[in-house]
Amino acid sequence: MISSLGNGIIIEMLKIGDKIGILCCSNGQKLSYREKIERLENVLRTIGLEPVFSDYIYEKENIFSATAEERANVLMQFYKDEKIKGIFDISGGDIANGILPYLDYEIIKNSPKMFWGYSDLTTVINAVYKKTGKASVLYQIRNLIYDFKEQQTVDFKDTVINKGNNLFRLDYRFIQGNEMHGVVIGGNIRCLLKLAGTEYMPDFENKLLFLESFGGTVAKMETYLSQLKQLGAFDKIAGIILGTFTEMENEKCMPTIETLVKEKVAKNLPIVVTPNIGHGTNSKAIIIGGELYIKN
């Protein structure tokens, strides 16, 4: 059975004319992406928002747009600037966790601004939740310029400007159990596990663990899931939400991610699958640190 889900979280809304911060906490963007970033700027202005770009968007040497401390400082400047009403990260890759020691979590905790990012920003989003209890949105705003840009733009504007819920309305199906309730943590499985053994990993107790992945076939997923099991995550959580696992699905890998997960967890642990969140350009959003109730 496929049902629709709206996660019912109230996020800080934006208004026409609001300034939003655009930055890259992870890998710098390739210079060849400049035209895409300019298109994104135009779309955001058409929606009615005023994007303010970090000085560290594009890579300078190798993957780096700036040092970890410099990238963290930009994020904190956006939090401190009262004219900036929302913060959107457009990067991904590998190096976002480097900024974590340089963030002022007290300022973040007391800010009404919502942070948006995906993939490698899983590290920042979960660290912010662990340190502050503050929710963030797992979503890539660059989706506004890709294959499904028309629908993405409609859903984004409906949710962020018009106080709708389209961006968070998901299709799902239970593959185990029929009900789950809890605060959502997680994101990209590889990036979440960078936090293992650090002060930034959220507590798994009674949480709903969301997982997705872009790269990796059976061997990598088996490794990641084994690590989560050895961390005790599967004994503590109240449910699992599986997003898309792009390479696994494209390669039609067997066993599937669903089978791998079910082999690692108790038979009474609820598991939900959604095709709507992950690295696809049609992906929607989920709030990490937000409470969610799902029923078959």
Positions of predicted regions on the chain:
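ATP/NTP phosphate-donor binding region
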Residues: 8-83
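Buried hydrophobic positions in well-ordered alpha/beta secondary-structure cores of metabolic enzymes
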Residues: 22, 87, 120, 192, ...
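Charged helix-capping and loop-helix junction motifs
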Residues: 36-37, 67-72, 223-228, 253-260
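Short internal beta-strands
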Residues: 53-55, 117, 237-244, 272
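Active-site histidine-anchored catalytic micro-motif
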Residues: 64-175, 293
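ATP/pyrophosphate-binding catalytic subdomain of soluble kinases
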Residues: 153-229
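Glycine-rich phosphate/diphosphate-binding loops and the adjacent beta-loop-alpha structural elements
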Residues: 209-210, 214-215, 239-250
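ATP/nucleoside-binding phosphotransfer catalytic cores, i.e., glycine-rich phosphate-binding loops
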Residues: 244-296
